[in-house]
């Protein structure tokens, strides 16, 4: 859910701690924690670029709170750290922060649950978030291209002025170019262009 709502990177998701969540303000902080001595994982998840604070809908905050209070806390050893996502499988790692390999297993199970999800990856949800963001911006005529770029870069954790958005925005740009080209051709066949 968080991958889709925020377009998070896997490392950002696995790096989340309960303390990063401010339920009073409805925000989630994405923080850099390189070489975290409190993280027991061999391959520690990292926040690749900029730290940021994301605003969350109250329904999403309720879901996170419900998970923490009614699900996560019941798992043995989960109270020994505050990483949000933990391992449920019984054994020596139960209650520990979820690893990259466990995360990929969870995504694989989700992918196999429906033929519609056959190509699902966490990173595709990041692309989906950017596509949906572009469509939402198109509906809001008050936001300039420059402001759109600034907002997108902040929300995605990119440095100001980053060109990375072009990679994530290809599908939306393709759809806009297709629509524009077809409108232009339609006008041509109607004889609406000036000679």
Task: Annotate the PLM regions.
Residues 16-62:
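Conserved tyrosine-mediated DNA breakage-rejoining catalytic core shared by Y-recombinases
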Residues 156-186:
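Catalytic-site neighborhood detector that most strongly recognizes the C-terminal catalytic loop/helix
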Residues 40-42, 92-99, 138-146:
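Short, flexible/disordered intra-domain loops and linkers
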Residues 57-118:
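Active-site/catalytic core of tyrosine-dependent DNA strand-transfer enzymes
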Residues 3, 14, 153:
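The alpha-helix within a helix-turn-helix
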Residues 8-10, 50-54, 65, 71-72, ...:
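Short, cationic motifs built from Arg/Lys/His that form the positively charged side of catalytic pockets
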Residues 104-154, 158-162:
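Short, basic (Lys/Arg/His-rich) helix/loop patches that form interaction surfaces
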Residues 1-11:
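Short pre-functional
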């Amino acid at each position: 859910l968080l991958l889709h709502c925020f377009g998070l990177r896997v490392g950002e998701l696995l790096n989340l701690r309960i303390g990063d969540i401010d339920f009073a303000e409805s925000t989630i902080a994405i923080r850099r924690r390189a070489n975290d001595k409190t993280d027991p994982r061999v391959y520690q998840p990292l926040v690749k670029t900029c730290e940021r604070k994301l605003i969350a809908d109250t329904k999403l905050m309720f879901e996170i709170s419900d998970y923490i209070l009614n699900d996560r806390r019941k798992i043995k050893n989960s109270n020994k750290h505050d990483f949000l996502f933990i391992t449920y499988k019984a054994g020596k790692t139960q209650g520990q922060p979820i690893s990259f390999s466990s995360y990929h297993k969870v995504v694989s199970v989700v992918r196999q649950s429906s033929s519609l999800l056959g190509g699902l990856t966490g990173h595709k949800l990041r692309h989906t978030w950017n596509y949906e963001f572009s469509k939402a911006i198109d509906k809001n005529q008050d936001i300039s291209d420059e402001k759109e770029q600034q907002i997108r870069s902040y929300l995605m954790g990119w440095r100001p002025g980053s060109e990375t958005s072009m990679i994530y925005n290809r599908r939306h740009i393709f759809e806009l170019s297709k629509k524009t080209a077809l409108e232009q051709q339609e006008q041509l066949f109607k004889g609406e262009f000036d000679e």
